[in-house]
């Protein structure tokens, strides 16, 4: 695959400093240690361990206010938009998101950039003795042999400690999974953001959407005495979910701002490299906003982020955020792995869609914002996902699909994915490849052949494309193959 680079990603380039081999080795060692703990997909409904660790660390999460983001789809994009807006308003930010695409350092960002491998390792080593103490206490608790701290709990503690050390003015905190029992819920955020909720992580959160909403609504917490009410900023939801979220907001005495009621997307126009928006915020109308991301769903993410930042700064009917700062913030937004272009001629996109809702948003964007005449999907999906739902959403926009394996032990094997794809696409439209690199080569051959077809030719390669999708792991692995640095 001549157009890609198979070397390891430069885990520190986003900071402007290239990490040394020793620093990379230390980072890998820390990751190995963290991987010995409970994985992020395993939930124990308790905040006892993370709360105890925060107490030992001096409650770093209380040293700055936070904007807390839960939901099913769009959390990371909203978090990155909030980060960019707050930065444009001259506040120092810390941001923690999950999972990472390429390097674990992406999970902890300060001033909009991932911390360096050296900082990541130093932060872990700083809290490591206290983590060991909590492990011992938990395992000895009441003689029951409780669990040690999970990987995500330790990562969350690292982020909160790094933010306090920086120090930051505002933390932008994305929930890992769920909300109520998520390790991030040791904060008491003045602004709780809920992106659209759908069914995902069925093995861990269940298949009852009202129950899922109840878990995610757990981040809407009562404000401390003497503080302004918490504000719940809620994106578009189905009625059953909205009912749960509003009930939780009442319980927490939280003010509520809902999309299409208190804020809305008024207008969007497709533009080169993204879209131009007119948004109704809590403080008024913001016009001529260029967002360098594709898709109607990103416009809704943008207005959700705007309302969240307005709520944080107290904007409302009598006070609007600075319009130039808002425009500058949105113009600076990046969201790696979200319909991100890797190359042109033929066009290659990667997208981290990993559930039916995400796949539907991807398909809608491809159908409405591009003029492809022949499009090939490269697909690897994790085995615990709704594979058929993802395939059903993508089938109308992909002429062919190449199914493969992204290297994750959780990924569905190629044979099983090919069988599922054949049922949706028909066997003639399905190809297989053992690994992602080979799959991209197969897809490239397919678009080369299509470009030579007189029914497609005219704009040739500009009318053919490849989309690599199916999971965050797939998008991250592809990003590394194309030589992109972690962001």
From Swiss-Prot:
Reaction equations catalysed: 7,8-dihydropteroate + L-glutamate + ATP = 7,8-dihydrofolate + ADP + phosphate + H(+); (6S)-5,6,7,8-tetrahydrofolyl-(gamma-L-Glu)(n) + L-glutamate + ATP = (6S)-5,6,7,8-tetrahydrofolyl-(gamma-L-Glu)(n+1) + ADP + phosphate + H(+)
GO process annotations (BP): folic acid biosynthetic process; folic acid-containing compound biosynthetic process; response to antibiotic; tetrahydrofolate biosynthetic process
Annotated TM spans: none
Cofactor note text: Binds 2 Mg(2+) ions per subunit.
Assigned keywords, A-Z: Antibiotic resistance, ATP-binding, Folate biosynthesis, Ligase, Magnesium, Metal-binding, Nucleotide-binding
Claim: Ligase is one of the keywords in the record: yes
Effect of residue 43 to T: In clinical isolates: Q449 and 1314; PAS-resistant; complementation with wild-type folC restores PAS susceptibility; 7-fold reduction in DHFS activity relative to wild-type; loss of the ability to glutaminate H2PtePAS
Cofactor(s) for this UniProt protein: Mg(2+)
One Pfam entry name: Mur_ligase_C
Signal sequence range: none
Positions bound to Mg(2+) 2: 201, 203, 384
Gene Ontology MF, one: metal ion binding
UniProt effect for mutating residue 153 to A: In a spontaneous PAS-resistant mutant strain; complementation with wild-type folC restores PAS susceptibility; 5-fold reduction in DHFS activity relative to wild-type; loss of the ability to glutaminate H2PtePAS
Binding site for 7,8-dihydropteroate: 44-46, 150-153, 181-183
Binding residues annotated for Mg(2+) 1, in chain numbering: 76, 98, 174
Gene3D superfamilies membership: Mur ligase, C-terminal domain, Mur-like, catalytic domain
Outcome, altering residue 73 to S: In a spontaneous PAS-resistant mutant strain
Record EC number: 6.3.2.12, 6.3.2.17
Family label: Belongs to the folylpolyglutamate synthase family.
Entry remark concerning the domains of this protein: Is folded into two distinct domains, an N-terminal ATPase domain and a C-terminal Rossmann-fold domain, which are joined by a flexible linker.
Subunit structure: Monomer.
Task performed by this protein: Catalyzes the addition of a glutamate residue to dihydropteroate (7,8-dihydropteroate or H2Pte) to form dihydrofolate (7,8-dihydrofolate monoglutamate or H2Pte-Glu). Also catalyzes successive additions of L-glutamate to tetrahydrofolate, leading to folylpolyglutamate derivatives.
Name the record gives this protein: Dihydrofolate synthase/folylpolyglutamate synthase
Organism, scientific name: Mycobacterium tuberculosis (strain ATCC 25618 / H37Rv)
Source taxonomy: Bacteria, Bacillati, Actinomycetota, Actinomycetes, Mycobacteriales
């Amino acid at each position: 695959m001549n157009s890609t680079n198979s070397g390891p990603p430069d885990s520190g380039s986003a900071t402007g400093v290239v990490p040394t081999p020793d620093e990379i080795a230390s980072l890998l060692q820390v990751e190995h240690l963290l991987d010995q703990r409970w994985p992020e997909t395993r939930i124990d409904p308790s905040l006892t361990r993370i709360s105890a660790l925060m107490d030992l660390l001096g409650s770093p999460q209380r040293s700055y206010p936070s904007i807390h983001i839960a939901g099913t789809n769009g959390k990371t994009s909203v978090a990155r938009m909030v980060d960019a807006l707050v930065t444009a308003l001259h506040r120092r930010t810390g941001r923690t998101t999950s999972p990472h695409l390429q390097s674990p350092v992406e999970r902890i960002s300060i001033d909009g950039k991932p911390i360096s491998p050296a900082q990541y390792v130093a932060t872990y080593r700083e809290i490591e003795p206290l983590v060991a103490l909590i492990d011992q206490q938990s395992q000895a608790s009441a003689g029951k042999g409780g669990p040690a701290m999970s990987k995500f709990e330790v990562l969350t503690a690292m982020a909160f400690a790094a933010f306090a050390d920086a120090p930051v003015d505002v933390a932008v905190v994305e929930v890992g999974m769920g909300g109520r029992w998520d390790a991030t819920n040791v904060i008491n955020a003045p602004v709780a953001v809920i992106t659209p909720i759908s069914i995902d992580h069925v093995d861990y959160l269940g298949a009852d959407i009202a129950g899922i909403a109840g878990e995610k609504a757990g981040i809407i917490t009562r404000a401390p005495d003497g503080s302004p009410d918490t504000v719940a900023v809620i994106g578009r939801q189905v009625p059953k979910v909205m009912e749960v979220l509003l009930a939780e907001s009442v319980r927490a005495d939280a003010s509520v701002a809902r999309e299409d009621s208190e804020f809305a997307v008024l207008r969007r126009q497709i533009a080169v490299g993204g879209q131009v928006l007119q948004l109704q915020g809590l403080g008024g109308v913001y016009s001529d906003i260029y967002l360098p991301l594709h898709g109607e769903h990103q416009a809704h993410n943008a207005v959700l982020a705007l309302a969240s930042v307005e709520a944080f700064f107290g904007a409302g009917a009598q006070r609007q955020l600075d319009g130039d700062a808002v425009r500058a913030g949105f113009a600076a937004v990046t969201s790696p792995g979200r319909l991100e272009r890797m190359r042109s001629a033929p066009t290659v996109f990667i997208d981290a869609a990993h559930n039916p809702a995400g796949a539907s948003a991807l398909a809608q964007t491809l159908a409405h914002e591009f003029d492809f005449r022949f499009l090939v999907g490269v697909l690897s999906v994790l085995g615990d996902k709704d594979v058929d739902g993802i395939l059903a959403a993508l089938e109308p926009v992909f002429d062919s699909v190449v199914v493969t394996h992204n290297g994750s032990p959780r990924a569905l094997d190629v044979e099983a994915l090919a069988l599922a794809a054949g049922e949706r696409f028909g066997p003639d439209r399905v190809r297989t490849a053992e690994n992602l690199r080979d799959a991209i080569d197969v897809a490239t051959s397919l678009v080369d052949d299509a470009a030579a077809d007189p029914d497609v030719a005219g704009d040739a390669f500009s009318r053919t494309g490849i989309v690599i999708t199916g999971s965050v792991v797939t998008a991250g692995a592809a990003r590394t193959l194309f030589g992109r640095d972690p962001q």
